[in-house]
Structure formats: structure tokens, C-alpha cells
Amino acid sequence: MPSKAENLRPSEPAPQPPEGRTLQGQLPGAPLAQRAGSPPDVPGSESPALACSTPATPSGEDPPARAAPIAPRPPARPRLERALSLDDKGWRRRRFRGSQEDLEARNGTSPSRGSVQSEGPGAPAHSCSPPCLSTSLQEIPKSRGVLSSERGSPSSGGNPLSGVASSSPNLPHRDAAVAGSSPRLPSLLPPRPPPALSLDIASDSLRTANKVDSDLADYKLRAQPLLVRAHSSLGPGRPRSPLACDDCSLRSAKSSFSLLAPIRSKDVRSRSYLEGSLLASGALLGADELARYFPDRNVALFVATWNMQGQKELPPSLDEFLLPAEADYAQDLYVIGVQEGCSDRREWETRLQETLGPHYVLLSSAAHGVLYMSLFIRRDLIWFCSEVECSTVTTRIVSQIKTKGALGISFTFFGTSFLFITSHFTSGDGKVAERLLDYTRTVQALALPRNVPDTNPYRSSAADVTTRFDEVFWFGDFNFRLSGGRTVVDALLCQGLVVDVPALLQHDQLIREMRKGSIFKGFQEPDIHFLPSYKFDIGKDTYDSTSKQRTPSYTDRVLYRSRHKGDICPVSYSSCPGIKTSDHRPVYGLFRVKVRPGRDNIPLAAGKFDRELYLLGIKRRISKEIQRQQALQSQNSSTICSVS
């Protein structure tokens, strides 16, 4: 069958495409470029989509074959397979809003939504089916000047629309030039800096609660959201959804939520038959309960020692002692050891309860002569303690007054066993051997634990009580002195405004003996940055000014030992220079102790505490507050009369 090109007579010119239907970048009479990715042309085959745009050459066939001429039909209107994106359409609408002169200067003719005009001669041919434009904001078409400059580049691949689909970083400036009449948007930045925050939210609890475990467990998505109890919506007549979901890994104490964690019904219905196992579900001392109270498994501990010199008069306030200024928060456990305590031990414990307030209860207390030890704990933690056991050691002859010796208290908190020992060793500058003997007698004679099982019996020794517990704190008046005499020590203390504490510690007898390994084996002491705590004139800040001229020394110390390295982290170690009722200054230490989950098959204290002392301390605290308010009211109501 003869082709359409062959049916054209040689003398007849090829029909021209209608005006206004020339593709962008196509010269009149030029064939369309082949689309990228289309199959190559096969000789002898013709594509119906390609319209004739050049005159046909005469064929070599016989005249009879051309006898029946066929009237040529105009070529089909070329179709632009161009999918305009929403961004491109919006850009076109913005261009149409401009002035007619600007449009004519840019396009030459009125733009047509269905076709694209040629920009000039020599432009590469347009492919039949350009790819669809992306709807991304980064692919808004460029201006005509940028488009025409990219048509001749080889990177465009002969496609003039490739510049249209490219991004332009100068889009805001171009839009401002096109729509020059539109007002400029104001700056988003405030004209002045914002006011200062009235509340400082930086706290130590947020820093510790945000610690990341080694397995990055805090950054993994939890399978079930945490449930936080709304403050009072569990009663009848309340909303149907009393529990709010909180997907945050950090439990924040918000004012609209209660600190009392909800208990799910399925946890109450579940029964655990793994008695004494760490994997038991719903265990009182298990890992789940420990994580609820201590997400980082660290308990805050306060340990203090004070030689009261038998004074009956107590300081008017113990806030500096129990609540030091450098601690932003109160501790979870308070252990106070006293040597040569006051005659009224009950009054001393009442003052401690009054100072700590209703948040703490006396878990246990013990006495050995004038050696006292009191153990206060937060009232919501008493359920996780085992029975408390105590033992005493006398290092002097029985007939004498029990002023020298040791007192030990032990218990298990969750799955970690604690031992606290307070001691008063032999006094005297040159009696180092006697003090070493007091230490040996103490570690051998303290009979602890008795009923509470050892958490790790394979690492215990019958000859040393400190090896039978996970965490051991030993504090008291050890009576180790600074050697060298009063003159040498006074010279170091009076060198300048800042005392050279490391130079003083070079003369310390205790540090010297610990380095030899003759005492406190395996124990450590926090770094000392305070002045010697002994011996002061009562009520003054001067050291002993009597005829004895005793050498200032670090007699009061706090030491610690742990079965597992790194379990005890000292936070602060200091003295209380403001308490001057004794010739000794109180010394305290703040610690962070790692706690492990435990088993429920141990003898539990079951919430036991000194209820009578608790009520007495709260009553006295309230009465003093009332007296303080009355004093303020009387002071405000008083007036000054002036006689004119």
C-alpha cells in the first residue's frame, strides 16, 4: 500500500502545520526529535504520530501507481504530553497577574495554556513525551532568562523543558519582582529578646532520670504506653477515662497528675509461683517495683558523724547539718552516728525527726553507751526494707564507761545489703597501734547478719564483717591525728586565705596507715576539701587555745566499701562549721548507691517504724511554726508612737 508521503505530487508543497501549533523549540519544517527511551525507527515502517513537515521526494514507482491521487489531510494537532504540577500552575497564575507589557516582553506573544512558544532559532528539538513534572516545592520552574540559557547546554539532553523542571534558589526574589505591588511580609523574629523565665527547671533529678542504659533501652519505643493517674478522677461521677496515656520515657511530676502510680487489674489478678525468684511477676522487691521508684537504680544516701562531747545543750537548728545548702534535694536515707552523745537520747532523736519533717520516719535506732546511731528513711520506702539487725563491740574494760567501741546496724533494701558502723577509737597522738587494734576487734566481733540471709555468701569471710555486705559505710571519731606537732600544722593553716589541704593530708596518720594496708582494707574516702574538724574552742572558730594545745586534726571521717566496683559514688564530703556546741565539727557525706532487685523470701520489716517518735516530732514542728507566725504577727502589729 503506498504511503502518504508517496501520494503527494512533486509539484505540490507539503501542507504546513496550523499557526500557533508549533512545539516549543521546533523549527518550521523540522522533524520532531525521537523521545528518549522509545524504540528506534525501523526502515520501511512509519509512525502515524509523526506528521509530514517537509516536501515529499518523488518516488521511483510507475505512473499508474500515482494515477489515483488522494487528497492530503492536514496533519493531526500535535499533543503536548506535559503534566503540569500544582506548583507550575500556581507559578503560571502569578505570571498572568503581572502587567501585559511584562508578559509580552517575556513571551513575545500571549501565552497559551495548551502550547509553549519557541524562544528563538537554534533551539533543540522537543521530545514527543517529556516526563511529568514533580510537585515538589524545590522544582518550581525558573524564569525565562534562566530557561533560555539552559537550552543550549548539553546537560539538558536536548529537552528545553528540563530547565522548567529544575529548581531555583532565587524563587522568593523572582516572586517579589513579578508581583512588585504585593507588600513585604514582616520579619518573624521578635523585635526584642523574650523576657526571662520565672521558673528555673534545671534540676539534678532530671539529669539523673535521663541517663541512658548501655543497651539504649530509653530510646526504644515501648510496646505499651505508660499510664498516669489523673488527680482525682477515679471516684463515682467522674469522667469515663480516668487514666491518661503518657508515651514519654521520663515520668514527669505534673500538677495535673498524681505521683501515686496506678495498679492495673491484670497485675493484681496475676499469680506468681516463683517464690524468691528475681523473675517473679508482681514481686515486692522485684525489678518492676524497683524501676517504679528508682528508674536509674540509684538511691541517695546521707551519712554523718559527730562527737557531741557530752553536751546537754543542742544546737538551735540542725538544718545546716541535715539539709546542707549544696544539696538541692533531700536524700532518701539518713544515717547519723554520734559519739559522746547527749544524756537525753530521746530528745536527740526527736530533734532529728522534727528537722526532717513528716516525709521521713525512724526505721531503727541503737545505742552502745554514749554511741548512738539513728536511721531515717522516706516513709514510702519502708516497705522495701528487711528486718533491721544491730550489734555492738566494746574495746575497753567492761567496768569502765562505754565511751569507746563500735555500733553496727545492717538491713537489706530491695536486693542490696547495707552495713553501717560508727566507732570511737582510742584517743592520743601517739596511740596509732591501739587504734589499729580497735579496728581489728570490731571487724571480728560484730555478729552480723543473723536472720537476714547474705546476698552473696561466696564472697563473705567469717573473719571480717565488712565482707558479708554489698555496701558498707564506716564513720565516726577515729582519733587519727596530723603528725608533726602544733607548730607545723598552724604554719600550714595560716599560709593565706586558701588553706593548702593536700599539704595537711600529707601528715595524716589514717591515710598513711591505709596506704600500708594495716587498716580499713578495701575502703575508700572521698576527697577532703574542708579544714580539720578537731579541736575547737566551744562556741568559737579558733582551734584549741588551752594549755594542752592539741594539734588540729581530721579525727572525724566517713569511709565506704562496696562489693561491686562503682556501686558507690560520692557526691559531697564536708563539715558543718556553723555548729559550735562541741569541740568537734560534724562531718557528713552525700552518696549515690546502686541498688539491685531482690527476693521476697527474706524477713521483711513490713512497714515498721517508730510511730510515737513520728507523732512527737510532727507535733513539735507544728508548734514551732505556730510560735513563729505569732511572733511575726506581734511584730507587724506593733506601732511606734511619736509625740509632736
From Swiss-Prot:
<feature type="repeat" description="11">
    <location>
        <begin position="183"/>
        <end position="185"/>
    </location>
</feature>
<dbReference type="InterPro" id="IPR036691">
    <property type="entry name" value="Endo/exonu/phosph_ase_sf"/>
</dbReference>
<feature type="repeat" description="2">
    <location>
        <begin position="15"/>
        <end position="18"/>
    </location>
</feature>
<feature type="compositionally biased region" description="Low complexity">
    <location>
        <begin position="152"/>
        <end position="163"/>
    </location>
</feature>
<dbReference type="GO" id="GO:0005794">
    <property type="term" value="C:Golgi apparatus"/>
</dbReference>
<feature type="modified residue" description="Cysteine methyl ester">
    <location>
        <position position="641"/>
    </location>
</feature>
<feature type="lipid moiety-binding region" description="S-farnesyl cysteine">
    <location>
        <position position="641"/>
    </location>
</feature>
<feature type="compositionally biased region" description="Basic and acidic residues">
    <location>
        <begin position="78"/>
        <end position="90"/>
    </location>
</feature>
<dbReference type="GO" id="GO:0043813">
    <property type="term" value="F:phosphatidylinositol-3,5-bisphosphate 5-phosphatase activity"/>
</dbReference>
<dbReference type="GO" id="GO:0004445">
    <property type="term" value="F:inositol-polyphosphate 5-phosphatase activity"/>
</dbReference>
<keyword id="KW-1003">Cell membrane</keyword>
<dbReference type="GO" id="GO:0046856">
    <property type="term" value="P:phosphatidylinositol dephosphorylation"/>
</dbReference>
<comment type="function">
    <text>Phosphatidylinositol (PtdIns) phosphatase that specifically hydrolyzes the 5-phosphate of phosphatidylinositol-3,4,5-trisphosphate (PtdIns(3,4,5)P3), phosphatidylinositol 4,5-bisphosphate(PtdIns(4,5)P2) and phosphatidylinositol 3,5-bisphosphate (PtdIns(3,5)P2). Specific for lipid substrates, inactive towards water soluble inositol phosphates. Plays an essential role in the primary cilium by controlling ciliary growth and phosphoinositide 3-kinase (PI3K) signaling and stability.</text>
</comment>
<feature type="repeat" description="8">
    <location>
        <begin position="75"/>
        <end position="78"/>
    </location>
</feature>
<feature type="repeat" description="3">
    <location>
        <begin position="28"/>
        <end position="31"/>
    </location>
</feature>
<dbReference type="Pfam" id="PF22669">
    <property type="entry name" value="Exo_endo_phos2"/>
</dbReference>
<feature type="modified residue" description="Phosphoserine">
    <location>
        <position position="241"/>
    </location>
</feature>
<keyword id="KW-0443">Lipid metabolism</keyword>
<feature type="repeat" description="4">
    <location>
        <begin position="39"/>
        <end position="42"/>
    </location>
</feature>
<keyword id="KW-0539">Nucleus</keyword>
<keyword id="KW-0378">Hydrolase</keyword>
<feature type="propeptide" description="Removed in mature form">
    <location>
        <begin position="642"/>
        <end position="644"/>
    </location>
</feature>
<feature type="repeat" description="12">
    <location>
        <begin position="190"/>
        <end position="193"/>
    </location>
</feature>
<feature type="repeat" description="6">
    <location>
        <begin position="69"/>
        <end position="71"/>
    </location>
</feature>
<comment type="similarity">
    <text>Belongs to the inositol polyphosphate 5-phosphatase family.</text>
</comment>
<feature type="repeat" description="10">
    <location>
        <begin position="169"/>
        <end position="172"/>
    </location>
</feature>
<keyword id="KW-0677">Repeat</keyword>
<keyword id="KW-0206">Cytoskeleton</keyword>
<dbReference type="GO" id="GO:0005930">
    <property type="term" value="C:axoneme"/>
</dbReference>
<feature type="repeat" description="7">
    <location>
        <begin position="72"/>
        <end position="74"/>
    </location>
</feature>
<dbReference type="GO" id="GO:0005634">
    <property type="term" value="C:nucleus"/>
</dbReference>
<keyword id="KW-0966">Cell projection</keyword>
<dbReference type="GO" id="GO:0034485">
    <property type="term" value="F:phosphatidylinositol-3,4,5-trisphosphate 5-phosphatase activity"/>
</dbReference>
<comment type="subunit">
    <text>Interacts (when prenylated) with PDE6D; this is important for normal location in cilia.</text>
</comment>
<feature type="modified residue" description="Phosphoserine">
    <location>
        <position position="99"/>
    </location>
</feature>
<protein>
    <recommendedName>
        <fullName>Phosphatidylinositol polyphosphate 5-phosphatase type IV</fullName>
        <ecNumber>3.1.3.36</ecNumber>
        <ecNumber>3.1.3.86</ecNumber>
    </recommendedName>
</protein>
<dbReference type="InterPro" id="IPR000300">
    <property type="entry name" value="IPPc"/>
</dbReference>
<keyword id="KW-0488">Methylation</keyword>
<keyword id="KW-0449">Lipoprotein</keyword>
<feature type="compositionally biased region" description="Polar residues">
    <location>
        <begin position="107"/>
        <end position="118"/>
    </location>
</feature>
<feature type="repeat" description="13">
    <location>
        <begin position="236"/>
        <end position="239"/>
    </location>
</feature>
<dbReference type="GO" id="GO:0001726">
    <property type="term" value="C:ruffle"/>
</dbReference>
